[in-house]
Each structure stands twice: as C-alpha cells, then as structure tokens.
Amino acid sequence: MKKEEKISAEEVKRVKGLGCLKDKRYEDIFNVRVLTRNGKITAQEARVIAEASDRFGSGSITMTTRLTQEIQGVPYDKLDDLFAFLAENGLKTGGTGAKVRPVVSCKGTTCQYGLLDTYDLSEKIHERFFEGYHDMKLPHKFKIAVGGCPNNCVKPDLNDIGIVGQRVFRRDLEKCRGCKKCQVEANCPIKVAHVQDGKLNWDGCNNCGRCAGKCPFHVTDDYVEGAKIYIGGRWGKRTAMGRPLSKIFTDMEEVMEVVDRAILLFRDEGNPGERFADTVARLGFEYVEKKLLGE
C-alpha cells in the first residue's frame, strides 16, 4: 500500500482490536502493543521486540501504563508481517477493547515492603482472566492491578479490581507495657499507632506490617498475611476511588474467585458503555459486595 493512503474507519477499528493504535499524524502508521506478563519479559523476548521495531517500525519502543511494550511507527502494510514475526517468537499483540485488559503488578515479590507474591498472583490472573476470558465481551474495559503493600505503587484502588497485600496482626495487648518510648509507635510510617491510657492504640492501621517484631514484649510478633480487594476504582477524565471489601483474604484462590465473580457480574449486569465503577454505583456497593463474596 502506498504511503499516506487513507485506511477505512472500519479497518482502523479492526486493527485497534489487535493492539494497533493509529498515529494521528499519518494516515497509515500505527503503534503496536506487544503483550507482556504484567510487565515481565525475558532477555530473548526483549531482543525479539527490539528486532521487530527495527524491521517493521521506526526503531522506537515505549511502555504503556499497563506495562505492554509499544512498537512505534509501523506502516499498515507491514502489520501482518509484524504479527507473523512476533508469533514465530512466542509473542502477540493486543491489550485494547471492551474486555479484561493486561494485568499490572508491582515488584512485591522481591520488594522489601512486599506482603504478597505479586508475580505469582498476577500471572495466575493474567492466565485465567486476560487470556482465558480474551473473547468475553464486556460493557467496557476492565482493569486489574496487584499491589504488594499499602504503598500502592501501582494504584490498585484506581482500577476496576485492585488487590493490595496486607499484614494483619493478632495483637496481644496483655503483653503491652505502655512504654513511654513505644517501638511500635516509633516504627509506624503513617503515625497512627500510639500509647493511650497505658496501652497501644492503632485505630486507622493500614496493615502495612512495618511494626512486625518491633515490640520487645512481642505484641506484634503474631500476624497473618493476606490481601485487601478494592472494587470500582477508575482513573481518567472521571476518577473514582475504589472501595475495599469488608474482609481480608488469606486464601489467594478465594481472591481469584472474587475477581471471577466481579468480571461475570460486570458482564451480566453492567450496561453497555459503562465502567465497573458506574455499575457498582448503580447497583449499590452492598449488593455488589454480597455477590462477590458469594453470599
């Protein structure tokens, strides 16, 4: 196809569904999203994407907010060759449309603050829902993020479903001596832990776990790690903060079931064109929570 030949709106829409976004400056140039596993690729995959960019695109690669790699400047008449080259090397394009979008996660598996194996959980979500529900048509896009701790580096509470690692203490206040220099208080990064009336008070604790093992009298030695799940978050032109479900999940398979129920509820009860945040607001948080908890 000749350069600058106009492409029909139907064809632009079709290739957008394959992860190819038209460069507004040209009639026949596209930026093509190559899928990753939640931002992770191997060194060999990186070499393949770099070669693909040189052979079929402009030689430039960008990262999207959902951690796909976007090959810049691919002419329309090279798209099929690019798809074939990537497929030969075990890669594919995508990440657009009214469906489950690429899952994002932080580095909680290796981060000093991580309370979840974010790599493992997000890869399971990727396989079961991004890949497994690839052909499921939803009312709108559906975004999932996995964060390892309340630092919220990947902003889970601004996604349709956000999962946040938690460390929940089984605090034994009988052991508390009401120390004038309380080590739990000293190590609380959000400054909510404090001694009140001779005992430790931690109303407002966000379960970051930074005080674990800090009390010399073992008040914070016993804990369980799990996850908080936020629903109905959204960023963009209309922002909505997600709300947390009322329980902490210690079984990751239960987390997977909640994600599954949320996607199916959105499919079945969402209105065409509305985001999950709007669905939750319209149906009511309490109703949606009961559905997601299987009650």
Enumerate the language-model features and the residues they cover.
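Charge-rich, low-complexity segments
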Residues: M1-K24, G284
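Small-residue-enriched alpha-helical segments and adjacent helix-cap loops
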Residues: E4-I7, V32-C179, G204
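Short glycine-/aliphatic-rich beta-strand segments at the starts of folded cytosolic domains
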Residues: K13-K40, V104-G108, R243-P244
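Short beta-strand elements
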Residues: G19-K22, I161-G165, A227-W235
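Short, flexible, solvent-exposed loop/turn segments with mixed acidic/basic and small polar residues
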Residues: L21-Y26, G57-M63, H194
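Iron-sulfur cluster-binding cysteine motifs and their immediate structural context
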Residues: K181-L200, N206, R210-G226
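A hydrophobic, small-residue-rich beta->alpha segment in the mid-to-C-terminal subdomain
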Residues: E225-A227, G233-G270
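Bimodal "functional hotspot" detector
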Residues: N271-Y287, K291
